[in-house]
Amino acid sequence: MSKLYGSIEAGGTKFVCAVGDENFQILEKVQFPTTTPYETIEKTVAFFKKFEADLASVAIGSFGPIDIDQNSDTYGYITSTPKPNWANVDFVGLISKDFKIPFYFTTDVNSSAYGETIARSNVKSLVYYTIGTGIGAGTIQNGEFIGGMGHTEAGHVYMAPHPNDVHHGFVGTCPFHKGCLEGLAAGPSLEARTGIRGELIEQNSEVWDIQAYYIAQAAIQATVLYRPQVIVFGGGVMAQEHMLNRVREKFTSLLNDYLPVPDVKDYIVTPAVAENGSATLGNLALAKKIAAR
């Protein structure tokens, strides 16, 4: 049998594990809730043990913060996460000790960003944001992740507040920073403003324009900092069909023709990989890449 590659998308609420071939075709995929580290890792190892004879490598895209510095004593750890029981867990070590193959470790949004570059074969510079329960971003420049001492935390940049939030005294929901992108635009901020879960809020509610205002600011930051070919927005908040055009309109207004960018319909987009599959595709490609070293 030809070589197989593994993908672990380690989310705060669920794990998605998959095995694929050299063409990134998925042969088997499972998902299960993220419970305790012991229980979740045990299920992960059991899944990949079935393919051990042909498994060449595995890539992990994880919730964080995580330590991706291979020279660090805590490389492979989930570090200061607020998720109960998962802080300071040697995630990679606990999984890899049962195998004799290389493992690649990065953030879940980095995996998604990489998957989107694979799906968009002519794109080498891209920023991928997930806008859901939390917010994060992965940035690729010339086919490589950016970052020095560690991964970026784009969800925790401070935002210019929307006038309605100022008027109503809404300061954000992030327990660390309040008025950062995550605190002002992630899913919990919708419910905090309205008392209604996001999926139940009417499309004509002004709260969507507030969300779009903050998400558009993120696109402005990505544009002026990285000058990417494309900015991709995924996650549950952006799954609302009306949101993409709202963000494009706010972005165009805020940028105010300061820099030349592609047509906004080609520049600010949703994922090219269906069914939230960007991270799995990215992980399979990253696993194949490290296996070839």
From Swiss-Prot:
**Name the UniProt record assigns to this protein:** Fructokinase
Catalytic activity reported: D-fructose + ATP = D-fructose 6-phosphate + ADP + H(+)
What species does this protein belong to? Streptococcus mutans serotype c (strain ATCC 700610 / UA159)
E.C. number:
2.7.1.4
| Residues holding ATP | T133, P188, G236, V237, M238, A239, Q240
Q: Which Gene3D superfamilies match?
A: 3.30.420.40
Which family does the record claim for this protein?
Belongs to the ROK (NagC/XylR) family.
| CDD domains referenced in this protein's UniProt entry, alphabetically | ASKHA_NBD_ROK_BsFRK-like
Establish whether keyword Heme is in the entry: no
Activity regulation: Inhibition by zinc ions.
Provide the residue positions that the database annotates as binding Zn(2+): H156, C174, H177, C180
Any single GO molecular-function term of the entry would be: ATP binding
What cofactor does this chain's UniProt record say it requires? Mg(2+)
Q: List the disulfide bonds.
A: none
Keyword annotations: ATP-binding, Carbohydrate metabolism, Kinase, Magnesium, Metal-binding, Nucleotide-binding, Transferase, Zinc
A Pfam family recorded for this sequence: ROK
